[in-house]
Amino acid sequence: MVEVLKAEGLIDGIGIQMHVDPQLLPSVESIVENFRSWDIPVYITELDVPTSNAMLKAHIFSNIIGAAIESGVVRQINFWGLGSASWQEDATLFDSNNQPNLSYFEVLKIVIERNCLAACK
């Protein structure tokens, strides 16, 4: 569908809602491959990972952010909600007191490691 819309000049970017089901997570390689194959800017919207397993959630967030950076075509990432009192419990980067959780620090780490605080566009 993306190719048809792009060929017709109807789109020049794509937004992807990413409410990630930890049980159905595609590989990082397939995420990067998809983003690059569209050959247009990608905007990740509504990113969250609903799971009470803090380590798994942090790992998934980190992998998605790393894949987005690696793709070179992701222009923006929006997270769904602030604290875990969001639409699904334990799905965000902050706990129910709006304090950073492990996922927050893993995302921050990957951004710093990839030197993207100022360099990512």
Regions found by a protein language model. Give the residues of each.
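Periplasmic binding protein-like
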Residues: 13, 23-26
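Aromatic-rich peripheral "rim/lid" segments of glycoside hydrolase catalytic domains that contact
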Residues: 9, 26-43, 47-121
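Histidine-centered active-site/metal-ligand motif
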Residues: 17-19
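Substrate-binding cleft/loops of secretory-pathway carbohydrate-active enzymes
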Residues: 1-12
